[in-house]
Amino acid sequence: MALPKTIMAFIAFISFLVSTTFAVDVFSTTNVVTYWGQGHDQKRLSHYCQQAEHDIIVIGFVNVFPDQGKGGWPGTNFGNQCFMGTYITPEGEETELLSSCHKIIEDIPICKAAGKTIMLSLGGQAVDGSKTYSVKTRQSAVYFADFLWRAFGPVSPEWDGPRPFGDNVIDGFDFDIEANGGANYEYMVERLRSNFATDSSRQYYLSAAPQCVLPDGNLGNVISSSAFDFIFVQFYNTPSCSAFNWAQNPSKSGFTFDSWVQFIRKGASRNAKLFIGLVGDHTRVSPHGEYTKDDSNYLALPDADKLIKAYMNKYRANFGGVMIWDALTSDENKLVTGTYSSNIKRLLLNNDPSRPTTTSKTMSSTKTSMSTTTSKYTVTTSTISSTSKISSSTWSMPTMTTSTRTTSSTATRSSTIVTPSTSPNPTTSTSTTSGHQNTTATTTEIETQTSKTFITTTSIWSSGTGIGTCTGIPTITTTPRYPNATFTSDTTGSPTMSDTTITLSVTSSMHQISDTTTTIPTFSTTPIQTSDISLSMPSGTTTSKHQSSGITIPGPPHMSTTIVPASPTKPGHSTTTAIVTTTFTSVCPTGITTVTTTYTTIYCPEATPMPTAGNPPPPPGMEWTTIVTTCTKCASTSAIMTVTYPVTVPSEPMTPTQVPGTLPPPGAPGTGSGIPPPKTPSNEPGSPGTLTGIFPPKPTMSVPPEMGGNGGDRTPVYTGGAGVVSPSFSVVVIVLGSIVYHIMQ
């Protein structure tokens, strides 16, 4: 079918618009790089992309190279994130290149919408030495580079070969070479740079992940002779030069950060950003083995703070931040103030000398001239009875059209994309992680930095609601589909304080709601430049106000309640109809956005408390959620803040009963879950073809068996860009729902 391909192409297009606006700030000294793809029972990529602390996420690994791969193609391993299906060459030979990575295909657009930079890592722990990966000749290097560019780079009509991540485009490649290094990798870098130059629409990056010993036998030469953007040094595994060793005695340690700075400054990577590589936890850094608390890998937060402070200030031109292996272990390392990676991000921001100091004092309201965009909907519903029969409620689904290409977009969360799919789990094994969210709806003191990379959130609503536009994101034009739903857009003046009003009508269980007109919602999109910000939360908690350059920030919602008993039409249990107007604060690319909305909700008083100013009910089908996000336009530098806003409650798709699989030890075959993978969707390559030159031939899709067949486990590589065994949305587009609706009509 063409429908899934149309949807994915649309998501990829919107992700491109957003990612060009929120690309990683390569000049920042506060970036956090996180490896993902090899964690034991790890969560989906989208889970980590919705956490503000991750700036660059490196997916691992392409762990088999063409010179060693079946059919002369590379092979991949992403743990539990792909099914067992692989591509087949035109000659009929099965390869090790995974073809059924549907979760990753769905999640990359979410990451791009959140401003994340997504890179793909090559190498990892070389389990079988030269049998695993190496580049034997210059011709092999060029072939491999072109294969990667065609398979994971921008979509090209000239390429009809494999696209493991669909139409998604990754932002660059990471070299985590831990065996057989040295010759020929410089030719890969040269060829990739040449390919990057053919696409001026976006920025691409190259990184390397050497171990801390200098010179590194596998990557030292290529780092010196070829230009890399990022160097992720693994300051663990090797005790003599580890970060842990530095923390014990900085003056006598063999910590090599200084030596690495001098090394890269003498070569082609002189402008590269250097990262301190750390492990995310001192337990379970390897899935099948635990390290003790006094091991020589894990660095406690107080020591990490000292290390960051010492080297960030010493080498500002080359210091880039911290690399963490890996997303899962960091997420499971629950500290008092959040996960390990979120604390590392906080330490980086705190130690950044460019971060302005914050002060608190009462904010005076000053009239400020600003233009805001107000979008209104008028929705008329018909009679509703207690028998749950709804006679033709007319909710319009507006036709959505995007304006011509601009440098902006509205990023909103869609339950069909953000929620991890509960379709049959792949038969591979790797990863579980619980996300870090700040669930306290209070005002947080702002911490700022110069980075431009973080999550942007706006509200989303069910069908029939309007979205106001934000400067810096694509303009969305809505057209009513039915005559009884109207959409207007007008411009108002300065923002004003708004109240939350709930009108209650208590009736018996058999009641009529006739000709009810609800206006939903008014969005006031107001860009605000501030040094300190007070956020209003829907929970009604008191917020402190800080100096804000004369900008008025809405206070907590207020509420007036009117109870009007209606004449019962039939005895029964009473229900309550509440008309709620509430205001909450969100963040858009241009600053703080105040969102005011009115909606109707019906509930049973016996089971649900009466709404109050401190406890406004969420819109129907939605719930309040609180996240920690970063505003890059709220002050002279970026600001971390806590915002609360409504999100759609996801509906879980029906799936067959699943039998958990057994995780095998590394390198051993495993047993499947008993649930076979689905057939490969139509947006992946089809029939074989023939290509000439240095490009690989087009593959034939390997289709997994139908239900009832047996799958198999794919053992994660487990190490790599941060290998620890050998010493070596948030936010998607709201218009997606409308596009799907109209396509299906």
From Swiss-Prot:
Propeptide boundaries: 721-745
Superkingdom of source: Eukaryota
GO biological process, one term: polysaccharide catabolic process
Keyword Cell membrane (UniProt): yes
Region (Disordered): 351-372, 395-446, 651-715
A GO molecular function held by the record: endochitinase activity
Matching SUPFAM superfamilies: (Trans)glycosidases
Parts forming coiled coils: none
Enzyme class: hydrolase
Compositionally biased spans, kind Low complexity: 357-372
Glycosylation sites: N438, N484
The enzyme's E.C. designation: 3.2.1.14
Record's keyword terms, sorted: Carbohydrate metabolism, Cell membrane, Cell wall, Chitin degradation, Chitin-binding, Glycoprotein, Glycosidase, GPI-anchor, Hydrolase, Lipoprotein, Membrane, Polysaccharide degradation, Secreted, Signal
Xref: InterPro entries: Cts1-like (IPR045321), Glyco_hydro18_cat (IPR001223), Glyco_hydro_18_chit_AS (IPR001579), Glycoside_hydrolase_SF (IPR017853), Glycosyl_Hydrlase18_Chitinase (IPR050542)
Signal peptide: 1-23
All residue ranges annotated as the GH18 domain in the record: 30-351
Reaction equations catalysed: Random endo-hydrolysis of N-acetyl-beta-D-glucosaminide (1->4)-beta-linkages in chitin and chitodextrins
Principal location listed in the UniProt entry: membrane
GO cellular component: extracellular region; plasma membrane; side of membrane
Catalytic residue positions: E178 (proton donor)
CDD domains for the chain: GH18_hevamine_XipI_class_III
Record's bilayer topology term: Lipid-anchor; GPI-anchor
Cellular compartments annotated: Cell membrane; Secreted, Cell wall
Sequence similarity: Belongs to the glycosyl hydrolase 18 family. Chitinase class III subfamily.
Function: GPI-anchored chitinase involved in the degradation of chitin, a component of the cell walls of fungi and exoskeletal elements of some animals (including worms and arthropods). Required to reshape the cell wall at the sites where cell wall remodeling and/or cell wall maturation actively take place such as sites of conidia formation.
Protein name: Probable endochitinase ARB_07371
